[in-house]
Amino acid sequence: QAGGDFGQTGFAVRLYEGIPALVLTLRSVQLRCQFKRLRTHLILVSTIILLSAGSEAESARKYRDLCSIVYPSDATIEWECRTLRAGESLEKLFGEHWIDVVRFNRIDRRHAQAGRSIKVPKQLYDLQAFTPLPLSYPTAELDEQFVLIDLSEQFLGAYEYGSLRFAMPIASGEVKNPTPVGEFRLTAAHRAHESCLYMIEGTNRPYPMNYALRFYINREGVSYWIHGRDVPGYPASHGCIGLYDELMQKEQYGIPNEPELNDAKRLFEWVLGGEAEDDRLIQLPQGPRVYITGRAPR
């Protein structure tokens, strides 16, 4: 499977080759997910692909040296490489600037573990108001809302009439499951979305994709979303765009103790103009335009 998530797309699904041509209309989210998991297993058997291979690849890359990842904006900040030691925390090391440091490294606190090497600016104040994205985007000056995603920088920008309102780091698709590039539009929002394909590592619990905003459905019916997820400091998703969601991490892993990073929620509520009243899938007939450009670092 190419990546992304089968998600709640709300249309009929045709069974794969070798199975009688049958179209099932699945009305409940739970039944749709069960069917898609079964469909995925059949695909995996027929092509001899093991889902565990993806998990092993993720585990192998989890501790990669962040100093070796090159972003174009690295040249604008003087920094040095530092390896985190046992007992150290970003809060203790950088005080009130810890959030600036994690954003600069495109990493969350759960993944800032002992043994990881991170980029540390020689002057922490250089990171104040840091963003690798343009403050103005003339192409979107007529758009009330516009989303720019730069894969080369691993950053997302939310624009209002061409002016940058806020920016946030992302985790895009890894090498084998790249995030699609081009022009898209947000077509659906789902506050309590979850994956129908992937589980929380080491469990049988579906991976949460909270505050999900759908921007693309490919020909195979695979949905691509912007949503909350782990942000390990490098492209690691199956094609979706991941944003900080420390509350989800607290619920699933027990850390961090005091969640603060909530970029997924912030973007979600910006698009909707406030909090969602419930957990139903919300269609966005005229959602904001999304432009994805660049190439993710390897």
Question: What is each residue range found by the language model?
Answer:
Residues 85-112, 166-167:
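LysM (lysin motif) carbohydrate-binding repeats in extracellular/periplasmic proteins that recognize
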Residues 67-74, 120-144:
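Intrinsically disordered, low-complexity Ser/Thr-rich linker and spacer segments
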Residues 65-97:
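Primarily a LysM-type cell-wall glycan-binding module
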Residues 41-50:
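Bacterial N-terminal signal peptides
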Residues 130-234, 288, 292-296:
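Gly/Pro-biased beta-strand-loop elements
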Residues 51-61:
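Bacterial Sec-dependent signal peptides at the C-terminal "C-region" and cleavage site
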Residues 61, 197-298:
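Exported/periplasmic cell-wall-interacting domains
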